[in-house]
Curated annotation (Swiss-Prot):
UniProt keyword annotation of Membrane present: no
Purpose of the protein: Plays an important role in the de novo pathway of purine nucleotide biosynthesis. Catalyzes the first committed step in the biosynthesis of AMP from IMP.
Native organism: Desulfovibrio desulfuricans (strain ATCC 27774 / DSM 6949 / MB)
Reactions listed under catalytic activity: IMP + L-aspartate + GTP = N(6)-(1,2-dicarboxyethyl)-AMP + GDP + phosphate + 2 H(+)
Pathway as given in its UniProt record: Purine metabolism; AMP biosynthesis via de novo pathway; AMP from IMP: step 1/2
Protein name, per record: Adenylosuccinate synthetase
Amino-acid positions noted as binding Mg(2+) in the UniProt annotation, renumbered to this chain: 13, 40
SUPFAM superfamilies attached to this UniProt entry: P-loop containing nucleoside triphosphate hydrolases
Enzyme class: ligase
């Protein structure tokens, strides 16, 4: 038995959905353990593209159990929209194979309103939130006033919690942010109207995981966003509102850390970032535009154009340290075709010193100068390669250099969007 954690090793959008979809074939269950519908995982099978924001990417495999853990914040509307979308495509989304932890917190309308109001008030100092209420929902969780999925079975409890929440939220919306307050009865009615459809999906996720492990089945833990968006270890304050590191797979679905055997870091062959925040290797020239165009770098959730730049080995070394990555899945390697040369950032210059690690002080990463190592580019079309030895020598050299700089083996190489366009070493 080998349970596997999948995490993004950069700032998100590394191609986790495709790798989760592929590894799901070897697993009994796939579990989301953090984040919400601010993540967008894209899977392409036989030319058909599916984008999922909440439901685990393994749902496209008919015989797999898919679970949403307690560490996820769940928008009931988005969950049901995904259920309906998948059902219309013939995917089995019955409660027999899809479950939500009763401990998962629910994103409420006032969370979304607060998210948008705060971002609007920040003006030129925006964090880059998706406005989907993720942060405010996690705030209520930490303040011990949030609604959990299991509360839906008790309408009186729902009404009491909404009434308590709106005393504060409406004051903030109306008086501080100059936004319209929300109607208590309407909020309750909207949520309780969804309860009959949601309640069958509520379950004890920990119990499912324990039973599958007892039977010798493998579990795939699916992370969202990327390591450097982690609330504690990311480029604060330009981070998400949850822990995205591999260790949170344990807390986010209720299993002991000894159940986590393998950690696969998903690494894009270049680097991208959405929204604000430091990005040492960002390219604002034709190279950045080429990567964005060739890589179709627009957010699956927001549609926003992604910032693009060269691969940063300093960032990846930090990812290995934080998450204990056992191996790497290198994605979007085909996007680099036809660039005259390739560059990898191997160190930073900062205040007269050369650093091989990320400085921790807030704002410091914005002041570093990347130190690059240049490698030859390639013109060959690699999208049809099915074995590692089929790749051009220059491509194999690029991969080997990444392994040397990071200290972790590249076990998978993605050379196209399709499930089949993946080389396993």
């Amino acid at each position: 038995m080998a349970n596997t954690v999948i995490i993004g090793a950069q700032w998100g959008d590394e191609g986790k959905g495709k790798i989760v979809d592929m590894l799901s074939a070897q697993s009994r269950a796939i579990v989301r353990f953090q984040g919400g519908n601010n993540a967008g995982h894209t899977i392409k099978v036989q030319g058909e593209e599916t984008i999922l924001h909440l439901i685990p990417s393994g749902i496209l495999h008919a015989d797999k159990m898919c679970l949403i853990g307690n560490g996820v914040v769940l928008d009931p509307h988005v969950f049901l929209e995904e259920v309906d979308h998948l059902a219309a495509k013939g995917v089995d989304v019955s409660a027999a194979r899809l479950g939500i932890s009763k401990k998962a917190h629910l994103i409420m309308p006032y969370h979304k309103s607060l998210d948008k109001a705060r971002e609007a008030k920040r003006a030129s100092h925006k964090i880059g939130t998706t406005g989907r209420g993720i942060g405010p929902c996690y705030e209520d969780k930490a303040a011990r006033v949030g609604l959990r999925a299991g509360d839906l079975a008790n309408p009186d409890l729902v009404r009491a919690k909404v009434a308590h929440a709106l005393q504060e939220k409406n004051t903030l919306l109306r008086d501080l942010y100059k936004f319209d307050p929300l109607d208590e009865a309407a909020v309750c009615q909207e949520l309780l109207a969804l309860a009959p459809r949601l309640l069958p999906y509520l379950t004890e996720v920990e119990d499912h995981i324990q039973k599958i492990q007892a039977q010798g089945g493998d579990i795939l833990f699916e992370g969202a966003q990327g390591i450097h968006l982690d609330i504690d270890h990311g480029t604060y304050p330009f981070v998400t509102s949850s822990n995205t590191v591999s260790g949170n797979a344990s807390a986010g679905c209720g299993v002991g850390p000894s159940a986590l055997h393998r950690v696969v870091g998903i690494v894009k062959a270049y680097t991208t970032r959405v929204g604000s925040g430091p990005f040492p290797t960002e390219q604002l020239d034709d190279t950045g535009s080429y990567l964005r165009t060739q890589g179709h770098e627009f957010g699956a959730t927001t549609g926003r154009p992604r910032r693009c730049g060269w691969l940063d080995a300093v960032v990846l070394r930090e990812s290995v340290r934080l998450c204990g990555m056992t191996d790497i899945a290198l994605t979007k390697l085909d996007v680099l075709q036809n660039l005259p040369g390739l560059r990898i950032c191997v160190a930073y210059e900062y205040e007269g010193h050369k650093l091989d690690y990320m400085p921790q002080e807030e704002g410091a990463l914005e002041k570093v100068t990347p130190v690059y190592e240049d490698l030859p580019g390639f013109e060959e079309d690699i999208t049809g390669c099915t074995r590692f030895d089929d790749l051009p020598e220059t491509v194999r050299a690029y991969i080997a250099r990444i392994e040397e700089l990071v200290g972790v083996k590249v076990s998978m190489v993605s050379v196209g969007a399709e499930r089949r366009q993946t080389i396993v070493r």
